[in-house]
Amino acid sequence: MKRIIMIYLVIFFGLSIQVAYPYWIWTPKVKKWVNPKTAIRPTPKEQFAFARSLYELKNYEEAKRELKKLIKSYPKALEAAESQYYLGLIEETQSNLYEAYLAYQKIIDKYPFSERIQEIIEREYKIAEAFMTGTKRKALGMALPVENPAIEILTKVIENSTYGPLASKAQYKLGLVLKGLMRYYEAEEAFNKVISNYPDSEWAKAAKFQIASCRAALSRGPDYDQGATGEAKDKFEEFVKEHPDAVLSRDAQKNIEDLKEKEAEANYNIARFYEKQKAYPAAKVYYDDIINNYPDSKWAAKALERLRVMEKRK
């Protein structure tokens, strides 16, 4: 029985050695056994060349492993920054856009000397645009229920290059993302920064329109806000006055008409309230205001009709 057990043990260890052996190779140069999976080339230049060759062969997972080994073993080498860049490229190629952004951002944070900084900012901006147009952040192929990553990425683009060529555009697009999420106060703040920080940019004019649009959206909430409606109308009128030939001025004029209609409706409802309370003088003030200040609205005719009804009651 002992002999049989010994035979099994010999076979087991023999197989174990056979399985394990290929992972360890004797290297005469350093005179020791090394594991190819964890081994690193003697210089960062050689390691990077090897990793890039794997990338060019589209062996992305192996390339990622070798690039990470370089960064870990030679963190201060010039090749470390380039390795981090290639990690971003691989993630982007594999459609892992948020992970690509994180990889690119590490270059700006850890390797500000890199010659690729402007290119990286541009890549980050394009990733943000992808998220703006509907791309979802995913894990294991499934969309994650998280805030639109475009907010974080655009904020970083602005931070990375406050007065760079993409800064004003990123600031404006940040406002659009927030507006699309109905975060109107934050959106208005973002648009205001376009005007204050980049007054001469091509986006400043559109930002003024968007501020008025945010105010208009607030006025359409479940609780009518007369102040927000008036402010929105004033902002649109200011925009039309300053930019009469702008394409957006036509939209602004339409918004002004809609807001006037809304103001007239609000005044009509107030007048009806006073009329029902038999406070006829107060009701007449509001009906007259509609007729005089909103003559083209549908509420003007209704106000005139109510005045005639009240007149008959005297």
Residue ranges and their predicted role:
Residues 1-4:
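Positively charged n-region of N-terminal signal peptides that target proteins for export
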Residues 6-9, 28-29:
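Short helix-onset patch at the extreme N-terminus, typifying the N->h transition
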Residues 8-16:
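Bacterial N-terminal signal peptides
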Residues 19-314:
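Acidic, polar-rich low-complexity tracts and alpha-helical solenoid repeat scaffolds
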